[in-house]
Amino acid sequence: MDQAIAGLAAGTASTLIMHPLDLAKIQMQASMNQDSKSLFQVFKSNIGSNGSIRSLYHGLSINVLGSAASWGAYFCIYDFSKRVVMSMTPFNNGEISVLQTLCSSGFAGCIVAALTNPIWVVKSRILSKRVNYTNPFFGFYDLIKNEGLRGCYAGFAPSLLGVSQGALQFMAYEKLKLWKQRRPTSLDYIFMSAASKVFAAVNMYPLLVIRTRLQVMRSPHRSIMNLVLQTWRLQGILGFYKGFLPHLLRVVPQTCITFLVYEQVGMHFKTQSSKSQ
């Protein structure tokens, strides 16, 4: 429960701060136009739609819901699976191996992806402004009514493949934590989380673009391979990295905030637990 609360708090805090960049990233990913807008142009377009900076927080509620739920569940499942796999190898000196980290984070990622995919479908559609959902609840209702279970799991295959991004990130993060011989400081946590996220993002970002486009499209005949070929034909290799700048500007600070809050909240619970014993 402590891990879930820490993860939920971390996910909520980071999403509240970084939402405008997520909005820009989704809109850039969803665009199939050959002429790409810059990050500044996307912000300007959103603000110009109603003349208020509040437009940059369009869809905030569904984003907070998804991030809080996914991070809370992820850290809880990851911590549980990590303890299980480590207990199966008693001669590990208390250190988790690369394979154990990949297995634990991969398992947690698959479970969370299955649980939260409908939230991300509604989020992608609200933030891309391709549909006129008045609120997230109407979005879920419309999605289930018109597209059923298949619509709820649009983009699920790339999400599962994208689990490897989280696995790569946690593998790098755990190894960096072991590299620090002393107790890590807040600055150490920021550096380790940023480095691990950049490492994973560069390798796996094209899957996020394909996932967003599958979720935004409402055609029942959407195909991953057709979308990959269409993106390559119309936009080339750069098409698979549309929105990468706002993605990095968002996820690196967001990951730093998430992991720092998670580690600090987790440390608080450990301290309180030791005092009560």
UniProtKB/Swiss-Prot annotation:
Q: Pfam families attached here?
A: Mito_carr (PF00153)
Span-the-membrane segments of this chain are: 3-24, 60-80, 102-122, 152-172, 190-210, 240-261
Q: Where in the cell is it found?
A: Mitochondrion inner membrane
Provide the Gene Ontology terms for cellular component: mitochondrial inner membrane; mitochondrion
The GO annotation for biological process reads:
mitochondrial FAD transmembrane transport; transmembrane transport
Give the principal location in a single coarse category: mitochondrion
What does the record say about its membrane topology? Multi-pass membrane protein
Listed GO MF terms: FAD transmembrane transporter activity; folic acid transmembrane transporter activity
Spans of the Solcar repeats? 1-84, 96-179, 184-268
Superkingdom of the source species: Eukaryota
| Keyword Transferase attached | no
This protein's UniProt keywords? Membrane, Mitochondrion, Mitochondrion inner membrane, Repeat, Transmembrane, Transmembrane helix, Transport
Stated family: Belongs to the mitochondrial carrier (TC 2.A.29) family.
Please give the PANTHER family that the UniProt record associates with this protein. MITOCHONDRIAL NICOTINAMIDE ADENINE DINUCLEOTIDE TRANSPORTER 1-RELATED-RELATED (PTHR45683)
What protein does this entry describe? Uncharacterized mitochondrial carrier C27B12.09c
- Please name the source species: Schizosaccharomyces pombe (strain 972 / ATCC 24843)
